[in-house]
Amino acid sequence: MAAVVAATALKGRGARNARVLRGILAGATANKASHNRTRALQSHSSPEGKEEPEPLSPELEYIPRKRGKNPMKAVGLAWYSLYTRTWLGYLFYRQQLRRARNRYPKGHSKTQPRLFNGVKVLPIPVLSDNYSYLIIDTQAQLAVAVDPSDPRAVQASIEKEGVTLVAILCTHKHWDHSGGNRDLSRRHRDCRVYGSPQDGIPYLTHPLCHQDVVSVGRLQIRALATPGHTQGHLVYLLDGEPYKGPSCLFSGDLLFLSGCGRTFEGNAETMLSSLDTVLGLGDDTLLWPGHEYAEENLGFAGVVEPENLARERKMQWVQRQRLERKGTCPSTLGEERSYNPFLRTHCLALQEALGPGPGPTGDDDYSRAQLLEELRRLKDMHKSK
């Protein structure tokens, strides 16, 4: 019955995803009594022994468009619900993890750590385009992992650095950011798992609210609530003052180099407010995003602002990096202000080109939110060259 429901929900929304889901369902049916799989789903729905999940929040927006590509790229509301609220999402993540490990045995990109007066930030390429991070106090030899979706890759980096993992910071619940929580927290028994209690983070031990601070050695990391991609999405700001270096923003799926995340669980006003939260940070703040999307995002930025010279210079640099499979993070918030269209909704040129004009009461935030929604719609239909 589950296979029929899932196949019906996905009808017309991408044959490839339907085939993947049917394969997962078939495998799951054959192994449905597996003890290990069902135990792995703490904080998420499982096929038995759990109450039925509540309906999706009415704030969750999914608006099919009349032309162009489906903005959720054949994911759809039904698949999103399955991915985030049932055990099928975990099985899908495990399948993607195996494929990525086979395709990119050394990671999808070549990355370099950044060292600042005894604090090291180490990007770890995982899955097909994700980044996890280790934040290390090199004097105390203590480490914090951000979004450790591939526990094997993160553990290898921990062992190579010779550090003790004491905390995991999860930006949000999606499996490509939280999938390694179980294995790492079991391996490192004193490791704490931080995240939003609103998001159903797997193996969460220490819930965080807006402006809460996590202290590890000299590391002072502040959680900032940034809902929109998910209801409980958090970003993490490493304070640069204790080590006399730049602050670092670990942005998950809120903000990318020249892009921002999809609004799965909110609306344009919510996402605009979250983006404005990080816009209030200093220009020298380093941006460490959750995905390697730079080249595609800059290509879209060139469509909406073709005469933006800052974007053109950054695109040339990114293309040189990607020719050698080098990662493109970090950028700075100062750079992002100059070319990221999702941070430029206040710019008159963009408003005149794409915006709907002022709101019914002349509210500037209304027109900026409408412009952000239009940018998101255009980006979802954009095909990078």
Swiss-Prot record:
InterPro entries in the record: Clx_II_MBL, HAGH_C, Hydroxyacylglutathione_Hdrlase, Metallo-B-lactamas, RibonucZ/Hydroxyglut_hydro
Induction: By Hepatitis C virus core protein.
Cofactor: binding details: Binds 2 Zn(2+) ions per subunit.
GO molecular function per UniProt: hydroxyacylglutathione hydrolase activity; metal ion binding
Gene Ontology cellular-component annotations: endoplasmic reticulum; Golgi apparatus; membrane; mitochondrion; nucleus; plasma membrane; presynaptic cytosol
Binding site for Zn(2+) 1: H172, H174, H229, D253
Post-translational modification (record): Undergoes cleavage at the N-terminus.
Record key words, sorted: Cell membrane, Cytoplasm, Disease variant, Dystonia, Endoplasmic reticulum, Golgi apparatus, Hydrolase, Membrane, Metal-binding, Mitochondrion, Zinc
Binding annotation for Zn(2+) 2: D176, H177, D253, H291
Cofactor needs: Zn(2+)
Catalytic activities: a thioester + H2O = a thiol + a carboxylate + H(+)
Expression tissues: Isoform 1 is only expressed in the brain. Isoform 2 is ubiquitously detected with highest expression in skeletal muscle and detected in myocardial myofibrils.
Subunit structure: Isoform 2 interacts with the sarcomeric proteins, MRLC2, MYOM1 and ENO3.
Protein task: Probable thioesterase that may play a role in cellular detoxification processes; it likely acts on a yet-unknown alpha-hydroxythioester substrate. In vitro, it is able to catalyze the hydrolysis of S-D-lactoyl-glutathione to form glutathione and D-lactic acid at very low rate, though this reaction is not physiologically relevant in vivo.
Name of the featured protein: Probable thioesterase PNKD
